[in-house]
Amino acid sequence: MAANKNKNQSSLVLHKVIMVGSGGVGKSALTLQFMYDEFVEDYEPTKADSYRKKVVLDGEEVQIDILDTAGQEDYAAIRDNYFRSGEGFLLVFSITEHESFTATAEFREQILRVKAEEDKIPLLVVGNKSDLEDRRQVPMDEARGKAEEWGVQYVETSAKTRANVDKVFFDLMREVRTKKMSENKDKNGKKSGKSKKGFKQRCCLL
């Protein structure tokens, strides 16, 4: 029975999501809230923690693999390896800390550098801790403007109240799915083109 369950899960489409952002912005809290419906305020930072969950995305069962990376500068050198494996990115900052918002530009540059061969990288900018409106340092218009400049979606979340937590993960998975479908279509088109070309050449030889 267990073997069948593993087989079924392994046949599901897997979307790989990377959590990116400065330390203390709530990346782990967002991840744990999405995974387990729990709010964890104090979390010890590590190099990276990986989570996997089966979800229903627009009527289809899929798996999401979430890699929660550390924001500390000490781990900057190993981030490249994590970024290479990612298919979509949640770029998180805290609305109560403007420095963490400023840092998103550097994180984005690192992602673009590592994924330079890819055309459009699925990425969402996430302003976390929206429940702390009285401590806001990053105006919503400023954050939204930066996201528009980058051509990506901006969403404000609260890991504490669970506001928009599911939304950011599901919206990102949709972008990842769209990119995969587009890439598969391109690959199939190229294969079809090669087949037609080969057939035409063989016809000429006959």
From Swiss-Prot:
Known EC number: 3.6.5.2
From the UniProt entry, list the residue stretches annotated as the region Disordered: 180-206
Compartment(s) where it occurs, according to its Swiss-Prot or TrEMBL record: Cell membrane; Midbody
Q: Where is the lipid attached (S-geranylgeranyl cysteine)?
A: 203
- Excised during maturation, the propeptide residues are 204-206
| Superkingdom of the source species | Eukaryota
Q: Which residues carry this modification: Cysteine methyl ester?
A: 203
| Catalytic activity of the protein | GTP + H2O = GDP + phosphate + H(+)
Which InterPro entries does this entry report, sorted A to Z? P-loop_NTPase (IPR027417), Small_GTP-bd (IPR005225), Small_GTPase (IPR001806), Small_GTPase_Ras-type (IPR020849)
One Gene Ontology term of the biological-process aspect is: regulation of developmental pigmentation
Q: Where is the composition biased (Basic and acidic residues)?
A: 180-189
Q: Write out the biased-composition intervals (Basic residues).
A: 190-200
Q: Which UniProt keywords apply?
A: Cell membrane, GTP-binding, Hydrolase, Lipoprotein, Membrane, Methylation, Nucleotide-binding, Prenylation
**Family per similarity comment:** Belongs to the small GTPase superfamily. Ras family.
This one is known as Ras-related protein ralB-B
Higher taxonomy: Eukaryota, Metazoa, Chordata, Craniata, Vertebrata
